From Swiss-Prot:
Protein's recorded name: Large ribosomal subunit protein uL2c
GO cellular component: chloroplast; mitochondrial large ribosomal subunit
GO-annotated biological processes: mitochondrial translation
Major place of residence: plastid
Pfam families assigned to the protein according to its UniProt record, in alphabetical order: Ribosomal_L2, Ribosomal_L2_C
Keyword Plastid attributed: yes
Region (Disordered): 1-22, 225-274
Compartments it resides in: Plastid, Chloroplast
Length: 274
């Protein structure tokens, strides 16, 4: 979708740049309410995830990541805004009467038809196993475990590339730059996730950020020593340490935090680029 620039009529719209949001009238049988998760607190009320709280109430949309309506053609009826993700979603009416939401593929318009199965055309929005796709195909919503549903490349603008097939595995280049192996029997959707201009958005004011449930972030260097290892000192003092740390004293900014000898290390050919 296109990015809309506001006229500078007020200070809050001076730097605002938002996408042209499509209206959302979700179907009642495809939504359900969510219980608020304590605004970043645990069961004792202690903050465990900082900078969270507030925000507008949301209804969760049930998204079909499995695409298990095999060999049944569906038509895109609406393209809707989803408050739970950056990508848009589209409502599909299948030939057997089933109605489901899927992630909106880039370039798909109302009236287009999609289908999932083993021998379906390599067309944007169609879902099929990796073994039936030619090399170089751009894909998204990729399964890691067969039948579990898509888990990779689901964010707005995300796209992966099928670069090799050998034996029982397919080699994919993911949006992060990581190259890894996945079973050829796993399914994926052809094309790129829509709303590629989401990274060009500028909320323009603090209130828009609060609507998203995100609270202000304060630098540790301006805190007191009791609140952060970087705090204290006279005037604009440096952090007083060799390397920056988290509020709890652990290394920050570059320290690798992935668990060693993780089972999935055997499937990763090249680590993601920093």
């Amino acid at each position: 979708m296109a990015i809309h620039l506001y006229k500078t009529s007020t200070p809050s719209t001076r730097n605002g740049a938002v996408d042209n949001q499509v209206k959302s009238n979700p179907r009642n049988n495809l939504i359900y309410g969510q219980r608020r998760c304590g605004k970043g607190r645990n069961a004792r009320g202690i903050i465990t995830a900082r900078h969270r709280g507030g925000g507008h109430k949301r209804l969760y949309r049930k998204i079909d990541f499995r695409r298990n309506e095999k060999d049944i053609y569906g038509r895109i009826v609406t393209i809707e805004y989803d408050p739970n993700r950056n990508a848009y979603i589209c409502l599909i009416h299948y030939g057997d009467g089933e109605k489901r939401y899927i992630l909106h593929p880039r370039g798909a318009i109302i009236g287009d038809t999609i289908v999932s199965g083993t021998e379906v055309p390599i067309k944007m929005g169609n879902a099929l196993p990796l073994t039936d796709m030619p090399l170089g195909t751009a894909i998204h919503n990729i399964e890691i475990t067969l039948g579990k549903g898509g888990q990779l490349a689901r964010a707005a603008g995300a796209v992966a590339k099928l670069i090799a097939k050998e034996g029982k595995s397919a080699t994919l280049k993911l949006p992060s730059g990581e190259v890894r192996l996945i079973s050829k029997n796993c399914s994926a959707t052809v094309g790129q996730v829509g709303n590629v201009g989401v990274n060009q958005k500028s909320l323009g004011r603090a209130g828009s950020k609060r609507w998203l449930g995100k609270r202000p972030v304060v630098r540790g260097v301006v805190m007191n020593p009791v609140d952060h290892p970087h705090g204290g000192g006279e005037g604009r003092a440096p952090i007083g340490r060799k390397n920056p740390t988290t509020p709890w004293g652990y290394p920050a900014l570059g320290k690798r935090s992935r668990k060693r000898n993780k089972y999935s290390d055997n499937f990763i050919i090249r680590r993601r680029s920093k």
